[in-house]
Amino acid sequence: MAKSVPAIFLDRDGTINVDHGYVHEIDNFEFIDGVIDAMRELKKMGFALVVVTNQSGIARGKFTEAQFETLTEWMDWSLADRDVDLDGIYYCPHHPQGSVEEFRQVCDCRKPHPGMFLSARDYLHIDMAASYMVGDKLEDMQAAAAASVGTKVLVRTGKPITPEAENAADWVLNSLADLPQAIKKQQKPA
């Protein structure tokens, strides 16, 4: 049996990149300051990096799945060029009220459901209790809780923080950029 590894689960829009709303083109994709360095440091610390992102714009007809895949490939290569290798990218193209029939459905992968997390856990042998979820919305925290992710981290770089999201989170940080230091501080012996 493969040894399980801890992971950092990462929402995309508002966590890795600035959320300009239905981001689907390279020209509109802007990495948030400090996140690439943080991701590199988290890899050095022994974490797998796994993106888990709702992409309802596909179901809503705002952009195609092919456009999303092109942008995702570009993001993955951009990170790899900066010595950040993602271990997995999981996305949900569905929405119950989508205008594109193929993707109009209730599914178990759309956050707050844990489907993407559980798929990653099984495929990558992730130790969920030792893992972290980083996101900017309540649904990110709820999905992480449903998947038994050990630490739920809410960041201020995306949507405005709601009291519900703050209550569902274990930690609230200004940015993903602050996570490596926060983990190191927590792991220091008292």
From Swiss-Prot:
The active site is at residues 11, 13. GO terms for cellular component: cytoplasm. Substrate binds at residues 11-13, 19-22, 53-56, 110-111, 137. It catalyses: D-glycero-beta-D-manno-heptose 1,7-bisphosphate + H2O = D-glycero-beta-D-manno-heptose 1-phosphate + phosphate. Its cofactor is Mg(2+); Zn(2+). Mg(2+) binds at residues 11, 13, 136-137. The keyword Magnesium applies. Monomer. This is D-glycero-beta-D-manno-heptose-1,7-bisphosphate 7-phosphatase.
